């Protein structure tokens, strides 16, 4: 599996990995890098570089487009780093990535993220209307 690196403000990425593992089992190829409140861009980048130094090819998912973790890594890409960076990560996106990797196909991470957002009240109303 191509490794996945989750980056976020605070420990959102750490907790997201734990939640995914509740469903998908242990995931040795998911790595996390948290930007903690007392850290700046330099410290975050140093932690990121330490994690990815041992990886040949990987995909990065960030919590928020325009946020510091995403911006720091985007600057690396603009400077010539060669990896994919997606922002707006959610659980459906991570699980979709893992499923695609297991099947040997390419995940459409944007579609996975969008499909993970549902107005449950509207969906339930559709079921109620269909059964009336």
Residue ranges and their predicted role:
Residues 2-132:
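N-terminal loops that bind phosphate or other acidic moieties
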């Amino acid at each position: 599996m191509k490794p996945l690196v989750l980056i976020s403000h605070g420990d959102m990425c750490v907790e997201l990995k734990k939640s995914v593992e509740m469903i998908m089992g242990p995931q040795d190829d998911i790595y996390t890098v948290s930007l903690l409140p007392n850290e700046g861009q330099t410290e975050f980048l140093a932690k990121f570089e330490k994690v990815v130094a041992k990886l040949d090819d990987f995909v990065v998912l960030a919590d928020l487009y325009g946020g510091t973790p995403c911006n720091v890594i985007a600057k690396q890409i603009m400077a010539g780093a060669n990896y994919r960076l997606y922002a707006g990560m959610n659980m459906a996106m991570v699980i979709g990535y893992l499923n695609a990797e297991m099947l040997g196909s390419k995940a459409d991470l944007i579609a996975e993220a969008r499909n993970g957002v549902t107005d449950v009240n509207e969906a339930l109303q559709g079921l109620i209307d269909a059964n009336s």
